[in-house]
A protein has these predicted regions:
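Signature of the first transmembrane helix
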Residues: 5, 14-21, 29-87, 240-267, ...
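Interhelical loop/hinge segments that connect adjacent transmembrane helices in multipass membrane
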Residues: 18-30, 34, 169-174, 193-201, ...
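Interfacial transmembrane-helix starts/ends
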Residues: 34-35, 97, 101-118, 236, ...
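Transmembrane helical elements of multi-pass membrane transporters/channels
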Residues: 36-53, 177-182, 200-219, 223, ...
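Interfacial segments at transmembrane-helix termini and the short loops linking adjacent helices
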Residues: 131-145, 332-364, 410
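Hydrophobic alpha-helical transmembrane segments
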Residues: 143-146, 172-221, 391-395, 409-434
């Protein structure tokens, strides 16, 4: 019987009031803890975003459009490796090791971070093999990247590991260490006459290694690459699909980057990356908030499932509105003089400014898709999220190349925007189907308390 249905003279009324008060306190505590974790996530993303923006600005100032284009291709390749690493290692960690006992978390982190390092080693070897084919400026950028990819993957895995445990402050500190060592390293290289794309790319990865070592000390856990196969086998139901999903997302960017270079020239890649720099804080926030929202969604799904769809809608609303607001600020509130200063010269600003509109449309679409994608991952609906990713990726890649041929630099970004908006619609359709299935499964479980107890005992 609910507390509201008990009259004040009922003997059980005091007990009901106590239970109701405790429930309200529990809900308030849950909300407070969620906001605290989200706050650390926003702070961590701010550090990551500002570091990436500062690095991009410094590189374009120091190297010029052509070398910055080569650096951008290396960054796109890094994103490809990063999505592969996350899909195989930290995405399953976030789904299955959020809100678990510390001993279980340490066991999962030991294997997940080791897997991330192994993925970095494999992709690094492949990147170094590509150096002989590329040569020139692009080859120099890929050489610096290939030598440091294992360190970059390991550093990224610590961020996800800390957020899975609700330790956002540790992730914030780790990213701060990377930023605090990276920017001085770039300045030192320029002062000593080593301002070229190889040394800048190498310094970017080497300083990530410093943060990766700091992550080991923070967690008190040593990565175990030897357990990579064991981790992959145990989580292949999620890892395989997340790998394909992340690889597709990165492949679209690879196709866009290389296609733009072939069709429009290497400088055009630099202009596109410069526009990404302008919307950088929102782009990184939209794509990176999953390290906060995914474990948070997993916690809410376990503890307060009725609030789960609301949380996913709020994620999409917040990210899409933030992206729209930032785009408006760039279009209306940023004087051209500031744009020249940020990008280094009017020669870079002039072709970059028109790209802000399609970039904003792209970012808003990504924000709308984010909530549904988070929900699908938290529910373990990897098959449904993969289906949405495949359709969106095919549309984005084809439209991006067609747009580059027909409409130049703007067309390639509008093509990506079409793909991400179609993907957002499919994501929400799949989310609705997955949530209906989850509710039906939960209803069946509640009707069979014995089965539910056996399931819970098995999980423990």
């Amino acid at each position: 019987m609910a507390a509201a249905e008990l009259s004040s003279d009922t003997p059980l009324a005091p007990v009901a009031r106590v239970v109701s008060a405790r429930s309200q306190l529990a809900v308030q505590r849950l909300i407070t803890q969620s906001f605290r974790r989200l706050g650390w996530g926003v702070a961590d993303q701010a550090v990551s975003s500002l570091t990436n923006v500062a690095v991009s600005i410094y590189v374009v100032h120091s190297l010029g459009a052509a070398q910055f284009g080569a650096f951008s291709l290396a960054y796109v390749t890094y994103g490809f490796a990063l999505n592969a690493s996350r899909g195989l290692s930290t995405d399953p960690l976030m789904v299955r090791f959020s809100a678990v006992p510390v001993r279980a978390w340490r066991r999962g982190v030991r294997r997940a971070t080791g897997t991330a390092f192994t993925v970095g080693l494999a992709t690094g070897i492949a990147t170094l093999a590509a150096v002989t084919l590329l040569g020139g400026t692009a080859g120099a950028a890929f050489l610096g990247l290939g030598l440091t990819l294992p360190l970059l993957m390991l550093q990224d895995s610590w961020r996800f590991s800390f957020f899975a445990a609700g330790r956002g402050g540790h992730a914030f500190l780790n990213d701060s260490i990377w930023g605090a060592t990276l920017l001085p390293a770039l300045v030192l290289l320029r002062m000593t006459g080593h301002a070229n794309v190889f040394w800048f790319t190498f310094a970017w990865g080497a300083t990530a290694g410093i943060a990766a070592v700091a992550g080991i000390l923070q967690a008190g856990v040593l990565p175990r690459p030897a357990y990579t196969w064991d981790w992959l086998v145990k989580h292949r139901d999620l890892g395989t699909r997340y790998l394909l999903e992340g690889t597709l997302s990165s492949a679209v960017m690879q196709v866009r980057g290389y296609g733009t270079a072939l069709i429009l020239g290497l400088a055009a890649v630099g202009y596109v990356q410069a526009s990404v720099t302008l919307v950088g804080p929102m782009t990184i926030l939209s794509l990176g908030m999953g390290l906060v929202t995914l474990p948070e969604a997993a916690r809410i799904l376990r503890r307060s499932p009725r609030q789960f769809p609301v949380f996913c809608c709020l994620v999409s609303a917040g990210l899409s509105l933030a992206g729209l607001a930032w785009g408006i600020v760039l279009l209306v509130g940023v004087p051209r003089g500031i744009g020249h200063a940020v990008l280094g010269s009017a020669d870079v600003w002039r072709p970059t400014y028109p790209l802000v509109i399609p970039q904003t449309i792209y970012v808003v679409g990504g924000g709308i898709a984010a909530g549904a994608g988070t929900g699908l991952h938290a529910m373990g609906a990897a098959r449904r999220s993969l289906r949405a990713a495949i359709i969106g990726a095919l549309i984005a890649a084809s439209c991006s190349l067609v747009g580059a041929v027909v409409w130049g630099i703007e067309g390639t970004i509008y093509g990506l925007a079409v793909g991400v908006w179609v993907g957002a619609a499919i994501n929400w359709f799949e989310f609705r189907k997955a949530w209906q299935e989850a509710k039906r499964a939960r209803a069946v479980t509640h009707k069979q308390p014995g089965a539910a107890a056996d399931s819970a005992q098995g999980e423990r």
